[in-house]
């Protein structure tokens, strides 16, 4: 039985926060007074920041699609069923779910509040908090 479901959208807040953090790190690398002999080092560091920024944006974009919370702490997402391993870590802007598949694969799923409707966000928080108190 489905307790809750939503069609997750891309979280614009998560995208902007990722871009802001990566941009600040890149700015610090560029503005530091590097000696000329350190040019290869700061170029490698800057390349790593850019590649990590791209990877971060791809991961954020992958966090969309239909998601369902089932009975007994199970979650159906991206065509797979996951068990919620621990109580979710919640803040006002999102929650972190620690998941494990039947095959033993583990994953951390960040659900941002702006990736779903406000009513869906409230319902999900309420249901998960109720399940937490019943354990």
UniProtKB/Swiss-Prot annotation:
Q: What does this protein do?
A: A probable inner membrane protein. Has been shown not to be a toxin, no effects on growth are seen in LB or minimal medium up to 6 or 21 hours (respectively) after induction of expression. Interacts with cytoskeletal proteins FtsZ and MreB; inhibits FtsZ GTP-dependent polymerization as well as MreB ATP-dependent polymerization. Restores production of prodigiosin antibiotic (Pig) in Serratia strains with deletions of sdhE-ygfX; overexpression of this protein and CptB also restores Pig production to a slightly lesser extent in Serratia.
Q: Which cell locations does it reside in?
A: Cell inner membrane
Keyword Nuclease listed: no
Residue stretches spanning the membrane: 12-32, 38-54
Q: Which domain of life is it from?
A: Bacteria
For this UniProt entry, what is the primary localization, expressed as one broad class? membrane
Q: So which stretches are on the Periplasmic side?
A: 33-37
Q: Which organism is it from?
A: Escherichia coli (strain K12)
Q: Which UniProt keywords apply?
A: Cell inner membrane, Cell membrane, Cell shape, Membrane, Transmembrane, Transmembrane helix
Which segments carry the region annotation Not required to inhibit FtsZ or MreB polymerization? Answer: 1-96
Per the record, ranges on the Cytoplasmic side are 1-11, 55-135
Name this polypeptide is given: Inner membrane protein YgfX
Task: Tell me the membrane topology, using the record's own terms.
Answer: Multi-pass membrane protein
* One cellular component (GO) term of this entry: plasma membrane
The SS bond pairs are none
An individual GO BP term: regulation of cell shape
Assembly behavior: Interacts with MreB and FtsZ; interaction with the latter requires FtsZ residues 33-49.
């Amino acid at each position: 039985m489905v307790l809750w479901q939503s069609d997750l959208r891309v979280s614009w807040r998560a995208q902007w926060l990722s871009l802001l953090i990566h941009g600040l790190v890149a700015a610090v690398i560029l503005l530091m007074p590097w000696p000329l002999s350190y040019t290869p080092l700061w170029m490698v560091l800057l390349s790593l920041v850019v590649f990590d920024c791209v990877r971060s944006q791809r991961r954020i974009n992958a966090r969309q699609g239909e998601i369902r919370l089932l009975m007994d702490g199970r979650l159906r997402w991206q065509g797979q069923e996951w068990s919620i391993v621990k109580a979710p870590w919640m803040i006002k802007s999102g929650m972190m779910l620690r998941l494990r598949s039947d095959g033993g694969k583990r994953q951390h799923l960040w659900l941002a509040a702006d990736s779903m409707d406000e009513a869906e966000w409230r319902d999900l928080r309420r249901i998960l908090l109720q399940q937490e108190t019943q354990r």
